[in-house]
């Protein structure tokens, strides 16, 4: 009997070891992976072969991972180096002949970490770090390399730039996940854009940039410093020399990769011939002269297909005139869009080179009241050879953005093996391992953007959507709903509450919790409201129903308070959560159950939820999908970040739900030039219109309404020409009844 127990114990241990060896999961997934059903222990004593010649950043990582003692004569042999080094010369044929490729082998005799170049060796170490678990390594042979040349992040969003500490954390995260590019281009950095792009950084900011460059180098990331001069650049020698001087100052700070952005501008800065001449001058007089410049990238003015003039030659001019080594960025068919084969073929044909993709996800600078924590999907997985780079534009919430960044790292390294859901789950487990299930629950219901000017949406709450739809349909029709669907919703709300509490108390990743806290509070209130609404549906008796009704109204008030006091940015202020499936389900169920109660008891309970009573109508393409917002007695159109092309005769109109005394209208088109092209009108019936005079101070337009009755407000381009403006502000203030 004793021998049988020993045999069973040994069999279990062998099974565990075999399972560990077989279930090797790596992110990003390698191009070629062979796993043996064996493991080895991390050596207690080892000989390091090639440590003095190999990439020092890789050697540093290796020594941090090894807990054993280094010896010159005994112990397991660990060979590390780059192709051509003596230490790994016999493995030259095994090393993939690709930039940043590597060969990794683990067996009982030797560990080999061999890169095609220094960065390849560093990436071999990142894979080695993932293989090492609890002091054990599976026997493997890996041949790996990236499918896309440049992979990373562009900090190119509008709003609050990342903090210095957040950027340092990001750069380390990129290195671990085999991303080689960080493009520094925050829209609100005054020394990146007009008018201060000509000026040097103050000492404090310069020192921080210098530290970022150093940390980027340690983690094998190209720090790409971008300049955004197009809004006020003069096409003359003086400005050209000032730009080159700024690049030289950044070079002295350690920067070795550069970008010039011409996005979201209007005026003479949009001239493609002049842009090409400037970039070529930078390339020939700066980038090619320096022996160590890595990347030179430009973002064009027409950076997506929908903004490209079909009758113009902007993109073809860049394709013909720009030096071949200069990369050209592209966001896809629209500002916010996924990358398709047809789309990338269209742009590559015009720019005569593979596009450098600027993917605008999970950026939320046009839906700042939402968190975008869902999976990365929608991009073609067969077009790696058609693009030179793939960088993601993140949220202003740096830590929260890592969920998508992790997934983009996996996609860009090996699109053919990219697994949307597995990568998303791995990302969450990497970012918050101690509460991965709770973060997954929160992220599952915080992935959609809500209605927005770009019309870009994401799936959300997919696991309960069928049950929610079936239940709501049956309940609204007065039919018996499926008990299993009802219980699914009950469990979902219970799990949401639990997850919220656990996340709020988590201390493992404090920066993440600080970022998401307002949304987590709102998430919990949403779940509590859902539970109470379901209890109203069960409707035991009149007094019980009224108790739950009063509680729901109190929860609505708490949610309104959070929405009005947290995340009060000037564009899309507030906190929205679970907006695609769960919140509409709760609101519609509440409205229906209150209607049934009122009919049964001849009552007049208010069934109002947070709906939008007013409407906005426009035939201006970039405005027509922008959501309306209500803040106290103000009705405002959500601002747009990009240049709005307002055709002659087109208009924007706000229709209120009733006639109100009007107080004033505030408009800002981001232009100091006199707004002689526009006409502002008000109406009570949408038929008879009264023109309202506008006063202008710099770019701000205002009109006092002196409590004139108003239900409709309309602004029209009455000129004969298209106007290019920025919709910074459009606010109607009324006197509430």
Swiss-Prot record:
Effect of mutating residue 158 to F: 99% decrease in activity for pNP-O-GlcNAc
InterPro entries with a match to the protein in the record: BT_4395-like_hel (IPR049478), Glyco_hydro_b (IPR013780), Glycoside_hydrolase_SF (IPR017853), Glycosyl_Hydrolase_84 (IPR051822), Hex-like_dom2 (IPR029018), HEX_bac_N (IPR015882), O-GlcNAcase_BT_4395-like (IPR048162), O-GlcNAcase_cat (IPR011496)
Enzyme Commission number(s): 3.2.1.169
Residues of the GH84 domain: 149-416
Protein residues bound to a protein: 156, 187, 263, 303, 358-360, 365, 393
Activity modulation: Inhibited by 1,2-dideoxy-2'-methyl-alpha-D-glucopyranoso-[2,1-d]-delta 2'-thiazoline (NAG-thiazoline) and O-(2-acetamido-2-deoxy-D-glucopyranosylidene)amino-N-phenyl-carbamate (PUGNAc). Not inhibited by Streptozotocin.
GO biological process, one term: carbohydrate metabolic process
Annotated keywords: Glycosidase, Hydrolase, Signal
Catalytic center residues: 264
Effect on the protein of changing residue 303 to F: 113% increase in activity for pNP-O-GlcNAc
Highest taxon of source: Bacteria
Region (Catalytic domain): 148-433
Pfam families attached to this UniProt entry: CBM32, Glyco_hydro_20b, Glyco_hydro_84_hel, NAGidase
Gene3D superfamilies, A to Z: Chitobiase/beta-hexosaminidase domain 2-like, Glycosidases, Golgi alpha-mannosidase II, Hyaluronidase post-catalytic domain-like
Effect of residue 264 to A: 99% decrease in activity for pNP-O-GlcNAc
Resulting phenotype, residue 263 to N: 99% decrease in activity for pNP-O-GlcNAc
Entry's Gene Ontology molecular function annotations: [protein]-3-O-(N-acetyl-D-glucosaminyl)-L-serine/L-threonine O-N-acetyl-alpha-D-glucosaminase activity; beta-N-acetylglucosaminidase activity; identical protein binding
PROSITE patterns: GH84 (PS52009)
Similarity remark: Belongs to the glycosyl hydrolase 84 family.
Protein task: Can hydrolyze the glycosidic link of O-GlcNAcylated proteins. Can use p-nitrophenyl-beta-GlcNAc and 4-methylumbelliferone-GlcNAc as substrates (in vitro).
Assembly: Homodimer.
Name this polypeptide is given: O-GlcNAcase BT_4395
